[in-house]
Design a protein with these regions (language model features):
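Nucleotide-activated chemistry modules centered on ATP-dependent adenylation/adenylyltransferase
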Residues: 2-364
Length: 364
């Protein structure tokens, strides 16, 4: 085989090489958030009274719904027995037009009737939930078109990912609930800065295992390392995680606190009027009672080019609502106490309503 030496190589050309195409800029690496070394990995205790004793603040998140209401009654009962009711703060994340009318006022009334002196309302700044869907769509569309151009494809033919929240992309919870509530944690931490140590906040959430397979996997007590830092340690407590629907309603009956009328209309849950995780019955109820909001959602479907819920459009939900209106007439609230009676019986429900009339002047 012929060998080559250095002198056999072709002479170097003096012609300038053709310019190379610029490599696409590498995406900026997201900085990994480090958790402060003082934040514990696991809770020190899972015993309810010990959790309350250890906490500097006991923050109860209230949506105004039945699970929040039952949880509030239980937490207040334990805190009062310990002489620590002054630690309890109730917070409501105001969702604007997305939530049922009067929900914030009901959540505050429930807190006041329980004897809680501090009630806080937080709200995400800027656009509301429905407008955030449109903003998100614009960003997703711009990103998809940019990637298509870089790949030499027609940007007009790109498929834009769904902008609506979903069970796998619950950005609505982080944007309009969890994020704003963390701003309250920051304020509460500042109020106890004189302690000279991380402030201990017990965050109470009314999530129950019976609601879904996903919630069944949640721990009753855990450290919220994402919300904790060197100034505050957040322990998440789900006091009613193992409770059944019947136990929730029995607690409400004993508490004598008013509950939201949407349950008498047949709703299983009280979240957004039109929640992407809601069942068909809850969504149709929402469209019948707040038709102008359902119409706004339907218009947004057209704007973002995707159904409100995978396999179920808001247009179809509105159609089902109209069918029921034609069959039953305009929706009217069934007799007060209907929802409770299904779980605890009419006798206990009548007793609950009579107590409300005597104590709070509410109609029996």
């Amino acid at each position: 085989m012929q060998s080559h030496t250095l002198f056999d190589l072709s002479p170097l050309t003096t012609q300038s090489p053709a310019p190379m195409a610029a490599a696409p800029a590498a995406p900026k690496a997201r900085r990994k958030r480090t958790v402060h070394v003082s934040v514990p990995l696991v809770p020190r205790t899972t015993v309810p009274d010990e959790l309350i004793r250890d906490a500097d603040w006991v923050v109860v998140s209230s949506s105004g719904g039945k699970d929040s209401q039952a949880m509030l009654s239980y937490v207040v009962q334990r805190a009062r027995a310990l002489g620590m009711l002054d630690k309890v703060v109730v917070v409501h994340a105001d969702l604007g037009r997305a939530e049922w009318d009067g929900t914030r006022e009901l959540a505050e009334l429930q807190a006041r009737l329980c004897g809680v002196r501090r009630f806080e309302v937080v709200r995400a700044p800027g656009a509301d939930l429905l407008d955030r869907v449109k903003i998100r769509y614009g960003k997703l569309k711009a990103k998809a078109e940019k990637e298509a151009r870089e790949a030499g494809e027609d940007p007009a033919r790109v498929k834009v990912p769904p902008a609506w929240p979903s069970s796998s992309a619950r950005w609505c919870t982080s944007d309009v609930k969890r994020g704003p509530i963390r701003t309250l944690y920051t304020r509460l931490t500042g109020e106890l800065a004189h302690l000279g140590r991380p402030v201990r906040i017990l965050a109470c959430i009314g999530q129950r295992a019976a609601e879904s397979d996903q919630r069944a996997k949640l721990a009753p007590v855990e450290i919220d390392r994402g919300a904790s830092n060197g100034k505050r340690h957040i322990t998440t407590w789900r006091p009613t995680h193992a409770w059944s629907d019947r136990k929730v309603w029995r607690t409400i009956a004993r508490s004598r606190l008013p509950y939201h009328p949407a349950y008498d209309w047949g709703n299983r849950r009280l979240s957004c009027v039109l929640c992407v995780l809601g069942c068909n019955n809850d969504l149709v109820n929402g469209a019948r009672r707040v038709p102008e909001l359902a119409a706004a959602y339907a218009r947004t479907e057209v704007t973002v080019g995707a159904d409100f819920k995978k396999g179920l459009s808001m247009a179809e939900i509105i159609r089902r609502a109209r069918v029921l209106d034609e069959l039953e007439g305009s929706a009217a609230r069934p007799p007060a106490g209907t929802a409770m009676a299904r779980h605890v019986g009419r006798a206990q429900t009548n007793k609950y309503r009579s107590r409300q009339a005597v104590l709070y002047g509410l109609p029996a």
